[in-house]
């Protein structure tokens, strides 16, 4: 604000209040890849673990590590999808999502668990407490379907419909965050595959739909931590999406003295926001 006093222009301003002592964070790990069962149906990949909270203490002058986890790979031969990779902010670690089940094994455990396969071993993987949910189990009767991967918002769902005519299970719901000033859904579970053409399991938000005969499981969208879609019959399974790390603190406080990893920087709703889609550091 400025004013004219006795012919002289005076000005007042609000200086920055110094380096932050605490920040709000969102840490999402990479999602798990969908499972592949040759001639059957794979489970959907579990979402990457998701952690978010305010009031996390930070210390000026010390570099804080930021790690953004990659998504787990889908498969083209009988195997579980690969687990996603952990994401890290300082001491906060979100666990990579579990791979969907493939030939002869249960869905893998992770931030959220991978879905069970159709045929053979039908158990789903478990999620990590406070980060995500379990996958849905598969079925082993007739034209079986794979279960959906777990998400940060709910468990994955088993295949839908009669056991001899099953649609792949839907992936678990994601988590809605507004840390970047918009409503964004992260960490949805991958859809389960189906042996029957066209009966794909629908994915959770920004995750990969399941495959079916002649249709490959879809890859999850990068930097949302979703699981990949399970395979159907002989089609490939989808890969999980990479994770993301976001922090914010009041815009009235000082900017960082250094960052690496090229974070996107936003200013909105009275906050400065830093978004990493690749690994780096931040120093206040």
Task: Tell where the protein language model's regions lie, with residue ranges.
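Low-complexity, glycine/proline-biased repetitive segments and flexible coils/loops
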Residues: 2-13, 20-284
């Amino acid at each position: 604000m400025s004013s004219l006093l006795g012919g002289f222009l005076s000005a007042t301003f609000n200086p920055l209040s110094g380096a932050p002592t605490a920040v709000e964070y969102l840490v999402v790990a990479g999602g798990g890849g969908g499972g592949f069962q040759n001639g059957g149906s794979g489970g959907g990949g579990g979402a990457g673990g998701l952690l978010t909270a305010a009031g996390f203490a930070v210390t000026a002058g010390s570099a804080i590590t930021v790690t953004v986890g990659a998504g787990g790979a889908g498969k083209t031969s009988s195997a579980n999808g690969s687990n996603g990779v952990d994401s890290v902010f300082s001491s906060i670690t979100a666990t990579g999502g579990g791979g969907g089940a493939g030939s002869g094994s249960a869905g893998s455990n992770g931030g959220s668990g991978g879905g069970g396969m159709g045929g053979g071993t039908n158990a789903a993987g478990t999620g990590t407490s406070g980060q995500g949910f379990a996958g849905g189990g598969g079925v082993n009767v007739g034209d079986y379907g794979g279960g959906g991967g777990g998400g940060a918002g709910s468990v994955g769902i088993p295949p839908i419909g009669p056991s001899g005519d099953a649609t792949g299970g839907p992936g678990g719901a994601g988590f809605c965050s507004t840390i970047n000033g918009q409503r964004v859904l992260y960490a949805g579970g991958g859809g389960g595959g189906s042996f029957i053409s066209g009966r794909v399991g629908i994915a959770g938000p920004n995750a990969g739909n399941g495959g079916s005969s002649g249709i490959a499981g879809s890859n999850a969208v990068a930097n949302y931590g979703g699981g990949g879609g399970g395979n159907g019959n002989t089609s490939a399974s989808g890969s999980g999406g990479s994770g993301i790390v976001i922090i914010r603190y009041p815009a009235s406080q000082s900017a960082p003295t250094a960052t690496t990893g090229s974070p996107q920087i936003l200013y909105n709703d009275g906050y400065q926001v830093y978004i990493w889609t690749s690994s780096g550091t931040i120093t206040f």
